[in-house]
């Protein structure tokens, strides 16, 4: 079984130093500690074991117990590891000691300890692994320029590495500092939300439509043209249907039949005898105007116009029917339906009032 130094021509390790008996019995076995044998402070890292470059081992070395191809037991004490090495020394034989001559200086140790190099439980940290880690920040400590052989005693070459941690008070500060930058855009976003207005157009309301219909009815009543004068009988004779189509004779036909203006207007329409009785109808109109009060006061102008239109239509009807009697003859006059010579002005007045009341409701 090869020694701990391997069979690659490396200088043989003095296994006598591994025995605590050799340290006590040999006066020259005492070895001074040097700077390269003690690691520098590593922060939170606990220095629980030490493996020197010359083979000095102390501390918890249980992770090295299965090194060397032994049994598969993973839990071995350092004493068992040292006892195994002592048995190997007894079999091979220890080199003779030279008591007279001073001890020769030990050869230069290798750059990387073979025990640490071949330890399978130690992680190998490199720059690629550092880039992939997010939780912690890894940094490798280089050895100071104390070694004279040009090789660093610690660091990547010696296998020692340091996982440095940020102090706990610094982490919240960094978070607060990082979180303070996006605070300004958030305030801007809130200002834009406060200045945002939502305007919805739901169309015209029912009240707007009612007011529009009432204004149209009032405008049409005010824009009604004045009736033609009664002193134009030739024009009415030349064109007999003109009185029926005129807006002043709304609701009447040449044969004397009155069109339906509504249930109320139809019930109030009646046929009266000849003779101007328009002044007799002014009483009911005035009475209805007095009863209606302020709601019918705005229709006063419409009622006056209706009365004037009724008087004008009466004169035109007399002239038109007189000319028709002369043209058609006595035979046609006998079969013709009697036509009233008087038009009640209040009929149109009540019809307009009822239409306005229906719009108001």
UniProtKB/Swiss-Prot annotation:
Bias (Basic and acidic residues) occurs at 167-186
Instruction: Please list where the region (4 X 7 AA tandem repeats of [PT]-[AT]-A-[ENT]-[PT]-[PTS]-[AG]) is annotated.
Output: 220-249
**Where is the PTM Phosphoserine found along the chain?**
19, 27, 39, 65, 73, 77, 101, 113, 121, 139, 180, 190, 192, 195, 270, 320, 323
Query: What keywords is this UniProt entry annotated with?
Result: Cell shape, Cytoplasm, Cytoskeleton, Membrane, Methylation, Phosphoprotein, Repeat
Q: Which residues carry this modification: Omega-N-methylarginine?
A: 53
Residue windows of the sequence repeats: 220-226, 229-235, 236-242, 243-249
Which family does the similarity line name? Belongs to the BORG/CEP family.
- What does the subunit comment say? Interacts with RHOQ and CDC42, in a GTP-dependent manner.
Recorded protein name is: Cdc42 effector protein 1
